[in-house]
């Protein structure tokens, strides 16, 4: 598994970047700062420092780790080339055949190309965050330049935190949705209690370490309907998605000892949450028709929403919209129906790419209100590969969705 930097280390790097930005500014201008004495704050020392030195100096890829971090962040791979479709393929199993000298010698001329199963993933999504800093707030509401700088940096960090929370919720919902709808029935095992679930988790971990074609979903890929693909998972690559309650129980079982004997920290291999729900998926096209819904969606940051907008089926919200008039009976929460839930999978099945370099774009100054608006753009791609092992253990009935 990938190494994870601590929040303290990341915070130190951000502080060092802020210090370096200040040193660069002082070297270019002077150490004697003012808020300016012009009619507006445009191009004054403070605005120049924040927009031209502080924000550009901070490495967004580092900042993405700090405060309200995304627990799946260590899986993300930075990728500069974005917007393309991603394709994954595997070579299907073949069986050696006996030498039969009675067969027609012309068989040697028959082609025998390797059969492949392929999975084409859609391109990722470019998302944006928007925030505005009012220079009059800076001028009148802060006693010192340090206070104003901390405020500006705090707003920036909060927007990055909001990105992290959204990414984490979407990734968790994707894993839960996949486990409940995409696995073969043979890979869903029933448990009747915590003790029974722990026993079946231990068995599943042993199963995934065997050469087997049982525990992947190659049949979900193009060309994989006929035939099989044998896989095996190393212990260090096996992770469990579950609840905090079950994680605390599993930490006291022989499963934890198995990882410990192998020199692996079991706590890093159990990704747990207090609640596996909280994400809602639209089940039919919805037309936004009420002022209440517009105000609600805008309050959560979707400032583009207007009456008459159509929200297509399959859209995902990371906050509860089920009480809005248009959404009632038209959304479902992506959540296991039972607290007995453990999804065991090979970590390589999670495909997570992003592009966070240069996220902060050139700001726009509005002279009427003496304020600066910033945009943060980032690219995110998340998918689950059918070519790696997975087993779900729960007590609810699970019916795989047909494609």
Curated annotation (Swiss-Prot):
It is found in: Virion. Keywords: Capsid protein, Virion. GO terms for cellular component: viral capsid. Assembles to form an icosahedral capsid. This is Major capsid protein. The lineage of its organism: Viruses, Duplodnaviria, Heunggongvirae, Uroviricota, Caudoviricetes.
